[in-house]
Amino acid sequence: NMSEIMGLEMIKSEFTIKDRRIDTLAFDPQSKSFVIIEYKRERNSSVIDQGFTYLSLMLQNQADFILEYNETQAGNLKRNDVDWSQTKVVFVSQGFTPNQREAVNFKDLSIELWEVKRYENDSVFITPIRKSHASASIKTVMQNSPEFKEVTEKIKEYSEENLLKGKSDDVVELYESYKNAILNLNTEIEVKPQKWYISFKKANSHICALEIQKNGIKLTINVAKGHLEDSKQLTRDISTVGHFGNGDYELKISDTKYLE
């Protein structure tokens, strides 16, 4: 169920490398990056230290992760196909302490916490713990850690600010208009900045993406070719050309006429 719950491809459980065992190794097909999933059983253990240890382990042994992917997926993944800058660690537990929650509340930290709750009727509720919008940078508290320096040189947590930096006020305003229109479609839609674009997701399904350009925006719609109702023929079929974001249709935006 990993694909439905987290939007990830399962690679291997109990993956061992350099005398360390990773509970689950997964792959994010959208960001083209590996994800390490650890199941926390000790409520008082440090998620920061363990998280950076695993991130460092992956960066130092990239070939082993590539080999494992290709052997289990019968694929032909190459080192350059992977965006190592978006590697992350996810801790899963029945509950996290306030200290653990606060420890990962940094806007540029590639470590996530997910809580799992099981109820009497055998239903299971799985939810990620959100970081506050006012969260600080991890660089303010971890500058003297050797592992931190190694990891932060290669791994980057992308933000809307990164992708909007240097853009004109008109483009920023245009982005905000379309972003708000998308979010107003459903309260469960989330904003997920990637390396080259900003993705909008609902329950780990990618709805669309906005690629910020110099004079406008490209909207990529996550619909397969032949399945989009576009009677006015506003979109372009990009199923046979390279592009950012998921989906086979693109709409170039320079004003607000497509908002409705």
Where are these regions (language model features)?
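A short pocket-lining beta-strand/turn micro-motif at the edge of beta-sheets
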Residues: 206, 215-219, 247-249
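Charged, terminal alpha-helix-loop-beta segments
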Residues: 1-184, 190-209, 213, 225-227, ...
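Low-complexity, glycine/alanine/valine/leucine- and proline-rich hydrophobic stretches
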Residues: 214-242
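Well-ordered alpha/beta subsegment
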Residues: 241-260
